[in-house]
């Protein structure tokens, strides 16, 4: 097993472990690839291993998704929840399409920017986690439509490298009155259309740089991401209900500081 295969597996595990927690999976994968010197198809590899995480959450929530969609014709609550997720997804579609090129040109995915945003996001998450002690919404399926739309706009901050999609949506939900469990759960549901849409778009944009030589490493990364994400999705809700998001906030800060020190040392 060569170096690239081992690193592909490690990056897949890292993607799966971090995709649904508020620490920025993309930031972690890009930083790990940078420091490990991974010779991969770059963005194409990152996009395709994210599909493993997407499949994991679809698998874990398959039963609940079936219940929601099958009952929607008769159940106003199910219809309202589907509409809430679609409303929250809408800002990412509009802003992503209109501003994608500008964002890519202005906000380069450099290790320094990612590290700084990890620290900033960690401080914000720590503050919000400690102040969110009077929730008004306790079920992701009952979030009001205006609240869902606001979460969708906040999610767009994740277009800045290192911010974290799940981190932005969780912080947004907490600020708008969700309890810690329902904030994470709504982030899960919102990730499905958001990540699928981003996957299709990025796959199309990167179709010319995929090659057969990289297929083996991509498959390994995909499988590792899927398995790790299943574990995280199954355990995260119970964890945050009991302990909150403080651990993830301090992790972001620690990783960001460590990366800045490493870069300063010339790594």
Swiss-Prot record:
It catalyses: di-trans,octa-cis-undecaprenyl diphosphate + H2O = di-trans,octa-cis-undecaprenyl phosphate + phosphate + H(+). This is Undecaprenyl-diphosphatase. Catalyzes the dephosphorylation of undecaprenyl diphosphate (UPP). Confers resistance to bacitracin. It comes from Paracoccus denitrificans (strain Pd 1222). It is a multi-pass membrane protein. NCBIfam families: PRK00281.1-2, PRK00281.1-4, undec_PP_bacA. Its EC number is 3.6.1.27. It is found in: Cell inner membrane. The keyword Hydrolase applies. The chain crosses the membrane at residues 5-25, 45-65, 82-102, 108-128, 143-163, 183-203, 213-233, 243-263. Bacitracin is thought to be involved in the inhibition of peptidoglycan synthesis by sequestering undecaprenyl diphosphate, thereby reducing the pool of lipid carrier available. One of its GO terms (biological process) is response to antibiotic. InterPro entries: UppP. HAMAP family: Undec_diphosphatase (MF_01006). The keyword Cell membrane applies.
